[in-house]
UniProtKB/Swiss-Prot annotation:
PANTHER family: LEUCINE-RICH REPEAT, ISOFORM F-RELATED, RHO GTPASE-ACTIVATING PROTEIN GACW. Keywords: Cytoplasm, GTPase activation. GO terms for cellular component: cell leading edge; cytoplasm; lamellipodium; phagocytic cup; plasma membrane. Its main location: cytoplasm. Pfam families: Carm_PH, LRR_6, RhoGAP. This is Rho GTPase-activating protein gacW.
Length: 1115
């Protein structure tokens, strides 16, 4: 007791007895003078201020005269230093003469320490005059009595004392021991065990007068009376920021009252509201919207899923949200699922989305939107749940919502399950016109795609290097003849698209089981090094499937999470899984027990003899997984404050520190700022071979100028591959379009990724395989060479009026790349340029090369990018290497041609005429004597820089000509009046014509100075009408020489054979080519090529009908 007061023994004994019975502790005791209203006289009494109540005792015997709880006080007034008046809710008034300053300080300090959330000036009024006394009373008050959890235990005890209720010991223990341990500020009614209505009333009233908790959650049944009590909480409380009331099963009226109190309480700042599964109807939704419209601090989370509201109610709510600019700029999560949008709600949603600049998650499943009204969206949306939204009318189609998806430029996760889409609709949805191809998580469950649809889906998803999770549950409704191809397409997809980390193939709600059809996919995971999470629940694969799973778990070190319930596993299957996990210390870390299968096993064991064995096996599986955790923990840098090497993380946090084994050389581990609180890890970047894009900021031109290009080393895979292709692959027919051996390609890639520097030439690796490895490298880069943010700059560059301006604009774009990227693409485009110059031989014009490489460079299949890529290939030297651009000569308009050049041209004409006029059978080739004449008669001027064919640039070698029958011979460059017949390979049409620069005109006289080659290939020449006579006369003088040696030169085994048709046209017979969709690595075609697997839609093939009248290469 702070103030000593002399009391008689009788008074002291009586007061201590009363305080002990009431479990009160006195804070202040003093003598006061009180006016007795009945007796109209002053009486001296003893005043005691305890922790919860005010006591008055008589001065003589210590008899209790009056007591009042602090929560009964309505006003405390003091007009001078010697008087205090206290008013109570029951209209009682206590007027006292005493030292007012000490009493007021004790009253205020006790109130604020016991009820930190009580509103001074509203709940209790302090009326103190003069005002100069207020600072000395309030500011000098100490709050040392405030305990852990904001003194919530004191508040709860005091409220229980006020209501006459015994406090729940479980709540007091939790408040004193659990909540302070990890700073939990979420009050969840589900954590309170067995409470009555009065207990709930005491708890909620305590929340009203305390400021510790910031979140209130209730997920269960609440009566109307309970909700009315909760409404009073939100009328008084000023600290709660999150409100969650779900599945209350109450009427809408008490919830409406609660929302009205929220709007009236200006001290309350809710940022999170979750009212799902409550019957709010339109009236409740409108009240909610009106309340949110009054918010001044914004709202980040709103969930009104399944609240029985119609389109008009939603339209009214969206109107209120749109009217509050603060809410539009702060809301990040909106869930309106299982409500009917209809036309009114769809319009309101679009208006809100047009202003919702911060919205990241939009969940609108089963809302029946009108497709044609979905015109506006938000570019900030990252997660979209559009599941269950079928078209409302037969006239609506996916085309109506393309603009809705197109505006979501940052979309990462999309759920399109149960929308009954078709494969053709999927092609539209995942076209470059939308942003869905950028999504890392795609859910297409229960769309009844069937086997054919799965094949189409794999083809669509194949180029998506951003895809990490794919869910196709319940799509195998009916088995067809395409089932094997569908499974193989999935295998190829997850094998080739190494970004896919999670795959879900569960049976879905329709229970469409794959059974034995799933076996090839399971066995393919033995060597898979990218998949981290797999779900095959409900497919009924049986013990044979369990055997495949056990082999996977035994060998695979990447797969960390597996769901396999509902597969008819027996006790033997459980034992196999147990043994495989034990034998692989880097096996699973998350395995959901197959409870339904275990239940079936136990039911079938009627005698119960195997129950103990089954239980022991399950325990061994769990123990093995726990033992495997330390082997899957990513090393943590102890300097960053992480776990020490000897400290073992708790089981609850171990799932967040899983790391996949790296592919290739190990990279330096990065520091983790928050270890133990991550989800499944991302696939690591594939070592130094995959540099990706620099993350340290853009490299300025000044920085580039200071970097010596000779100090930048290209990845061995790139440099070795390009060097070999320059030397051996420039004239290879169909280079980059020809299908390479998938096995050989993977072997080469694996060796390079392991850090081995392979001598491709010494090992005699096929050029098609090297081309496939090179293209695969650029396709698998974490970021494309030309990212999406540069695409618009490319389009603007191509709109320039002249070639010079276009070239300069493209050079400016190239300068924005990192030095390593600049060096890589410079060397790669040099190769492509050289290949394009041999288009008459290799049938790869710049347009055809662009079809192969544009999707890889730009990571897009937009046809508008093809002419850009083609232009860069043709104008390589102008864009990438203007210093070494060869000097081309044009003799067609020069009257003073030098005699040597004139002699060369004349000889060329004579030789061409000779070869064209000589009747040679298709089985023969030019004689050796002609080859000698070509080498001895024609003199070609070389540039000093032209030492090797692959370093010459546009002045490359190996340009053959052929006679009318398609037989080729090595010749020097042709004069101006002879034009070659260009490659007739079919190619994708460009969006706009490409202007050929002057150095690449139709006249072949520009190619004077190229070195000769001994390599023979196929080609064709069509002479202009203007030089027919000259050619004919020249042929008479050399016809004898051309036929002196009729013996044919054998064709090398590796060179393609040519089939000749009556009109002299030739077609390729030995090679097959892929289309723009990269079908050379397509997941939808078998790896072993057969006649059954060759289709017009996937191959440029040559199956010609012997009776057909063809004029060129045909499909």
């Amino acid at each position: 007791m702070t103030t000593p007061v002399s009391l008689s023994q009788v008074e002291k004994k009586t007061i201590e007895s009363i305080l002990t019975n009431k479990k009160e502790e006195g804070k202040l005791i003093t003598k006061v003078t009180i006016l007795n209203e009945k007796k109209k006289k002053l009486e001296i009494k003893t005043l005691i201020l305890s922790s919860n109540r005010i006591f008055l005792f008589t001065d003589s015997k210590g008899k209790l005269s009056a007591e009042h709880h602090y929560l009964e006080i309505t006003e405390i007034a003091s007009q001078s230093e010697n008087d205090v008046t206290i008013k109570f809710k029951n209209q009682n008034v206590m007027k006292m003469n005493l030292d007012a300053s000490e009493v007021l300080k004790t009253l205020y300090g006790t109130l604020m320490s016991t009820f930190p959330g009580i509103k001074i000036g509203k709940t209790i009024i302090f009326n103190i005059t003069p005002a100069s006394r207020i600072p000395s009373i309030f500011q000098a008050t100490s709050f040392k009595d405030i305990q852990g959890c904001g003194s919530f235990n004191l508040t709860y005890r005091s409220v229980c004392d006020h209501l006459g209720v015994q406090p729940l010991s479980s709540i007091l223990w939790d408040i004193e021991n659990l909540y302070p341990f990890n700073q939990v500020r979420e009050f969840n009614l589900a954590e309170i065990y067995q409470y009555s209505f009065t207990d709930l009333k005491a708890i909620l009233l305590s929340l009203s007068y305390n400021t510790y908790f910031q979140s209130f959650q209730s997920n269960g049944k609440l009566s109307n009376e309970d909700l009315n009590l909760l409404a009073e909480v939100f009328k008084e409380n000023s600290s709660l920021q999150q409100l969650t009331i779900t599945n209350s099963q109450a009427s809408k009226e008490p919830i409406i009252t609660l929302l009205q109190n929220v709007a009236e309480n200006k001290a309350l700042h809710l940022s999170h509201i979750n009212l799902n599964n409550n019957s709010l109807e339109n009236k409740g939704i409108l009240t909610l919207g009106s309340s949110i419209q009054t918010f001044s601090n914004g709202l980040t989370y709103l969930n009104i899923e399944n609240t029985s509201c119609s389109g008009k109610g939603l339209e009214a709510m969206f109107g209120c949200l749109t009217a509050n600019n603060v809410v539009c700029g702060s809301m990040t999560h909106l869930n309106i699922s299982n409500n009917k949008l209809e036309s009114y709600g769809t319009n309101g949603l679009c208006k809100f989305l047009s202003k919702a600049t911060a919205l990241q998650q939009l969940l609108m499943s089963n809302t029946s939107p009108v497709y044609s009204f979905l015109k506006t969206s938000s570019s900030s949306i990252q997660t979209l749940d559009f599941s269950g939204n079928k078209s409302t009318t037969t006239k609506e189609s996916v085309i109506d919502i393309l603009s809705f998806f197109k505006q979501m430029s940052h979309l990462q996760t999309v759920n399109l399950s149960r929308i009954q889409t078709t494969p053709d609709d999927l092609k539209l949805l995942f076209s470059p016109a939308t942003s869905l191809l950028k999504c890392s998580s795609v859910d297409l469950s229960e769309n009844d795609l069937g086997d054919g649809g799965i094949i189409k889906l794999c083809e669509i998803m194949y180029p998506n290097s951003n895809l990490h999770h794919l869910s196709i549950d319940g799509n195998f409704k009916t088995k067809s003849k395409l089932r094997a191809r569908a499974i193989e397409a999935l295998i190829n997809l997850i094998d080739d698209n190494t970004s896919i980390e999670s795959l879900s193939l569960a049976s879905g709600s329709g229970k469409y089981q794959l059974k034995g059809d799933l076996m090839p996919l399971l066995l393919s995971l033995l060597k898979n090094q990218s998949l981290v999470k797999l779900d095959i629940s409900g497919n009924g694969v049986g013990d044979s499937g369990a055997l495949a799973v056990s082999k996977i778990l035994w060998k695979n070190q990447t797969l960390k999470s597996l769901k396999c319930d509902g597969n008819d596993f027996s006790y033997t299957a459980l034992k196999m899984i147990k043994c495989s996990i034990r034998r692989n210390e880097k096996s699973l870390t998350i395995l959901q027990l197959p409870l339904s299968d275990i239940s079936t096993i136990l039911k079938n064991d009627s005698n119960g003899s195997s129950h103990e064995k089954i239980l022991k096996t399950i325990q061994d599986i769990q123990t093995s997984i726990v033992i495997n955790y330390p082997n899957n923990i990513h090393p943590i840098d102890t300097s960053s404050g992480g776990l020490t090497p000897t400290k073992q993380p708790s089981i609850g946090s171990l799932a967040g520190v899983i790391k996949k084994p790296p592919i290739g050389p190990p990279s330096t581990p990065t520091k983790s700022s928050n270890p133990g609180f991550q989800t499944l890890p991302k696939r690591p970047t594939r070592g130094p071979l995959y540099p990706g894009r620099a993350t340290g900021g853009a490299v300025t031109l000044t920085d580039k100028a200071q970097i010596n290009a000779s100090t930048i080393e290209l990845p061995p895979l790139v440099s070795r591959s390009i060097d070999l292709l320059m030397e051996q692959g420039i004239s290879s027919v169909g280079i980059f379009r020809t299908c390479a051996s998938a096995t050989a390609l993977k072997k080469i890639k694996t060796r390079f990724e392991a850090g081995e520097d392979i001598d491709l030439k010494a090992e005699n690796v096929d050029v098609d395989t090297v081309a496939g490895v090179l293209k695969s490298y650029f396709r698998e880069l974490p970021n494309p060479i030309f990212p999406e943010n540069l695409h618009e700059y490319f389009f603007q560059a191509m709109r320039q009026s002249s070639n010079e301006e276009i070239i300069q604009s493209l050079k400016d774009i190239i300068d924005q790349l990192s030095p390593l990227e600049c060096k890589m693409i410079k060397k790669l485009f040099h190769l492509l340029h050289l290949i394009s110059l041999e288009k008459d031989v290799n049938m790869m014009s710049p347009e055809n090369i662009a079809i192969c490489w544009a999707p890889t460079f730009f990571r897009s299949f937009a046809s508008e990018l093809l002419p850009i890529n083609s232009f860069m290939i043709v104008n390589y030297f102008d864009i990438f290497d203007p210093e070494n651009k060869p000097i081309s000569s044009d003799n067609s308009g020069d009257a003073d041609t030098d005699s040597t050049q004139s002699t060369c041209t004349t000889n060329n004409n004579n030789l061409v005429a000779t070869s064209l006029s000589s009747p040679i059978s298709p089985s023969t080739t030019p004689t050796k004597s002609i080859d000698n004449v070509l080498h001895t008669t024609v003199e070609v001027s070389r540039s000093p820089n032209h030492e090797r064919a692959h370093t010459v640039g546009p002045m490359t070698s190996k340009r053959p000509i052929s006679n009318n029958n398609g037989v080729s011979s090595n010749t020097p460059p042709l004069p101006n009046n002879v034009t070659p017949h260009h490659n007739t390979m079919p190619s994708r049409p460009s969006a706009s014509p490409i202007k050929r620069p002057p150095s690449m005109g139709g006249s072949l006289s520009n190619f004077a100075g190229i070195p000769l080659s001994n390599h023979s290939s196929s080609g064709q020449l069509n002479n202009n009408n203007s030089n027919n006579n000259t050619t004919s006369n020249s042929s008479n003088s050399s016809s004898g020489k051309s036929s002196s040696n009729p013996s044919p030169i054998p064709t090398p085994p590796d060179s393609p054979s040519m089939s000749y048709i009556g009109d002299g046209k030739s077609t390729l017979r030995s090679k097959r080519f892929s289309r723009v969709n990269r079908v050379s690595y397509s997941p939808v075609l078998p790896r072993a090529w057969t006649n059954e697997s060759r289709t017009v839609s996937s191959l440029f093939q040559d199956d010609l009908d012997s009776n057909s009248d063809s004029s060129g290469p045909s499909l």
